[in-house]
Amino acid sequence: MNKALFLCLVVLCAAVVFAAEDLQKAKHAPFKRAAPCFCPGKPDRGDLWIFRGTCPGGYGYTSNCYKWPNICCYPH
């Protein structure tokens, strides 16, 4: 009985380790949750963030235009 309980504990610990590793990869997802958009006077495509008042930080956005209630953010 003790061996079976120990085996269950080992399997549970391994499952927790692999689940935590998978969550770390999910934090650094290679895609943005934004749709493509275009602003007048801008030749490139921007990122449309829905129901946001400002562009989110960490993506290198330098300019934007409002498309109420959304915002189109440009990285250049």
Curated annotation (Swiss-Prot):
Disulfide bonds join C37-C72, C39-C65, C55-C73. SUPFAM superfamilies: Defensin-like. Gene3D superfamilies: Anthopleurin-A (2.20.20.10). Keywords: Cleavage on pair of basic residues, Disulfide bond, Hypotensive agent, Ion channel impairing toxin, Nematocyst, Neurotoxin, Potassium channel impairing toxin, Secreted, Signal, Toxin, Voltage-gated potassium channel impairing toxin. Residues 20-31 form a propeptide. It is found in: Secreted; Nematocyst. Residues 1-19 form the signal peptide. GO terms for biological process: regulation of blood pressure. Moderately expressed in the ectodermal tissue from the distal and proximal tentacles, body wall, and oral disk. Blocks Kv3 voltage-gated potassium channels. Reduces blood pressure. Belongs to the sea anemone type 3 (BDS) potassium channel toxin family. This is Kappa-actitoxin-Avd4c. It comes from Anemonia viridis.
